[in-house]
Amino acid sequence: MTQTKEERVHQVFESIYKRYDMMNSVISFQRHKAWRKDTMKRMKVQPGDHALDVCCGTADWTIALGEAVGHNGKVEGLDFSKNMLLIGEEKVKEHKMKHVSLRHGNAMELPYADETFDVVTIGFGLRNVPDYMQVLKEMHRVVKKGGKVVCLETSQPTIPVFKNLYFFYFRRVMPVFGKVFAKSYDEYSWLQESTMSFPNREKLAEMFREAGFERVDVKPYSGGVACMHLGVKGKN
């Protein structure tokens, strides 16, 4: 029986959860932390904000948001992989963040009321959902008017030679890293497949606007291998 995208992604993350953080560092050459740090600066999260981290995984960005909003704020992380959430829960406990909570749920149908959050993030998760636009619209729905929705995701370089090297790395090298470091060749082959089929930064910016966002800001990182998209929900 052929798996749906949702079923395959769920299987992947339920399998690789123990080595997910290590592999993120190996695959991105530790750059993912710098990308997230710069994205956080651009977001200008305020103390006391109420934030949601969609597809939170092992909760690294969730915890960064928790630090930014402070104990007078509130952060919720949501993911459909219970195993990834187990790792995330341990991290939240280690950081003693009582204002941060994690929840099992589906990004396609966010279990929150309209206009609940000041900021909504999704980090390296949008490419894994069955319907990109549906998730963007859901994030638009739950963010407050004037609030921000931010996506940090893999992208494709535009410089021809670099683009060819990048595609070779993702297709040939990264699955081997997955086999060596995480014992998961098949699972990490999914990452290159999902990255190759994901919209480029211009198309994703257009999708943000189609979902209803204004003042869409785009920031590529490391020659375009990753990219931040930030959109604001209009006040009208």
Swiss-Prot record:
Positions with a binding annotation for S-adenosyl-L-methionine: 58, 79, 106-107
Keyword Cytoplasm in record: no
Record carries keyword S-adenosyl-L-methionine: yes
GO molecular-function terms, A-Z: demethylmenaquinone methyltransferase activity
Pathway assigned to this chain's UniProt record: Quinol/quinone metabolism; menaquinone biosynthesis; menaquinol from 1,4-dihydroxy-2-naphthoate: step 2/2
Family: Belongs to the class I-like SAM-binding methyltransferase superfamily. MenG/UbiE family.
Alphabetized NCBIfam families for the sequence: MenG_heptapren (TIGR02752), MenG_MenH_UbiE (TIGR01934), PRK00216.1-4 (NF001243), PRK00216.1-5 (NF001244)
PANTHER family linked to this entry: 2-METHOXY-6-POLYPRENYL-1,4-BENZOQUINOL METHYLASE, MITOCHONDRIAL (PTHR43591:SF24), METHYLTRANSFERASE (PTHR43591)
Name of protein: Demethylmenaquinone methyltransferase
Organism in which the protein naturally occurs: Alkalihalophilus pseudofirmus (strain ATCC BAA-2126 / JCM 17055 / OF4) (Bacillus pseudofirmus)
Top-level taxonomy: Bacteria, Bacillati, Bacillota, Bacilli, Bacillales
